Amino acid sequence: DVPASIDWREYGYVTEVKD
């Protein structure tokens, strides 16, 4: 599970909500 609350700008990539 990927937390939708993750700020992808902090990580440098887009995190989509996947199960």
From Swiss-Prot:
GO terms for biological process: proteolysis. It comes from the Eukaryota. It catalyses: Specificity close to that of papain. As compared to cathepsin B, cathepsin L exhibits higher activity toward protein substrates, but has little activity on Z-Arg-Arg-NHMec, and no peptidyl-dipeptidase activity. Its EC number is 3.4.22.15. It is found in: Lysosome. The keyword Thylakoid does not apply. The keyword rRNA-binding does not apply. Its main location: other. This is Putative cathepsin L3. GO terms for molecular function: cysteine-type endopeptidase activity.
